């Protein structure tokens, strides 16, 4: 059964996979990524008090290894909001000639490049690739990525740029292949926009203050036990990121006393396909329900497509040992 579900500020396509799940639906890899800033964030007040040298030291790598961007943005101080700080950096990059922008993207290391030297990539970039999983691909996928990187450089003489933390592995590959058909002007414009997303997230995790940009989304669930007409407290929920015929666990949680669960919060919701797995049989077994052997429903799966990394997606489920449904 295919359903469409809208949320407060997001959109997802949901497919309910009904019936009993025997074993794992897909080959699995478990990677519970914990993105976030490495150092304690600065305050906007501290940023506005910096001299030029301190400002460039703090933001010289926001646009990867390009302190000139920070030097230009420094002239816009004081920044009334964190959003204004990021916009000043983006405006500094956007104001230079197209040739200089291309040179910036040309110097970037290729996505997933295992041979890149430490001085040619920032810690932030390494973290972003780690969270998306492109630094730990299978050998087959790594070879596929190497070929795409070469084809992209051969055509555009630039490194392929995408906001890793806003996209799943599957979406990164899809976008890579799709964007190879673009012309240079289109591709440069897309690369600049993706760099905007990358740097906005970096600034938001580096500085706290007034007017924070929205860079995180949230995926939540609410499960009701229709047998007793109460919230389902203690149901295990796993979230898998789908790529081809494999699944990668990216979150795990348990519903609270109100039947609610924060599945993916405090980070962008990467564009891509997902599968929620609700351990329904285990939950009702603990409630003392008489279940068949095997139970009618074991693990219930709900498939989603997320396409708003900063959106709010809520998945409400009503269930019994013999039925389940989405509700609004």
Residue positions per predicted region:
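Aromatic-anchored, charged helix-turn/loop surface patch used as a conserved interaction hotspot
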Residues: 44-49, 57, 61, 68-148, ...
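Charged phosphate-binding loop/patch that engages nucleotide di/tri-phosphates or the phosphate backbone
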Residues: 192-213
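Beta-strand-dominated extracellular/periplasmic modules and repeats
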Residues: 212-308, 314
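Compositionally biased low-complexity segments at domain edges in trafficked proteins
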Residues: 307-328
């Amino acid at each position: 059964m295919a359903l469409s579900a809208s949320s407060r500020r997001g959109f997802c396509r949901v497919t309910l996979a009904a019936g009993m799940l025997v074993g794992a639906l897909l080959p699995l890899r478990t990677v519970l990524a914990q993105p976030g800033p490495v150092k304690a964030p600065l305050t906007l007040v501290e940023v506005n008090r910096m001299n030029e040298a301190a400002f460039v030291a703090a933001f010289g790598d926001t646009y990867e290894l390009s302190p000139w961007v920070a030097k230009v943005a420094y002239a816009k101080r004081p920044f009334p909001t964190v959003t204004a700080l990021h916009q000043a950096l983006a405006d500094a990059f956007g104001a230079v000639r197209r040739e200089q922008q291309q040179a910036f993207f040309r110097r970037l290391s290729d996505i997933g490049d295992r041979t890149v030297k430490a001085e040619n990539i920032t810690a932030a970039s390494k973290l972003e690739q780690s969270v998306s999983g492109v630094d730990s691909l299978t050998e087959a996928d790594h070879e596929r990525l190497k070929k795409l990187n070469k084809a992209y450089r051969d055509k555009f003489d630039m490194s392929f740029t995408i906001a890793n933390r806003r996209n799943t592995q599957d979406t990164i590959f899809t976008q890579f292949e799709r964007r190879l058909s673009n012309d240079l002007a289109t591709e440069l414009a897309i690369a600049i926009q993706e760099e905007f997303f990358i740097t906005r997230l970096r600034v938001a995790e580096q500085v706290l203050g007034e007017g924070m940009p929205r860079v995180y989304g949230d995926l939540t669930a609410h499960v009701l036990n229709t047998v007793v007409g109460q919230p389902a407290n203690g149901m295990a929920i796993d979230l898998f990121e789908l790529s081809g015929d494999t699944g990668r666990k990216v979150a795990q949680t348990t519903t609270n006393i109100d039947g609610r669960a924060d599945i993916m919060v405090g980070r962008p919701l990467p564009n891509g396909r997902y599968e929620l797995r609700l351990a329904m049989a285990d939950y009702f077994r603990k409630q003392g329900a008489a279940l068949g052997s095997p139970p009618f429903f074991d693990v219930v799966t709900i498939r989603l497509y997320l396409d708003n990394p900063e959106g709010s997606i809520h998945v409400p489920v009503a269930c019994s040992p013999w039925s389940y449904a989405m509700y609004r």
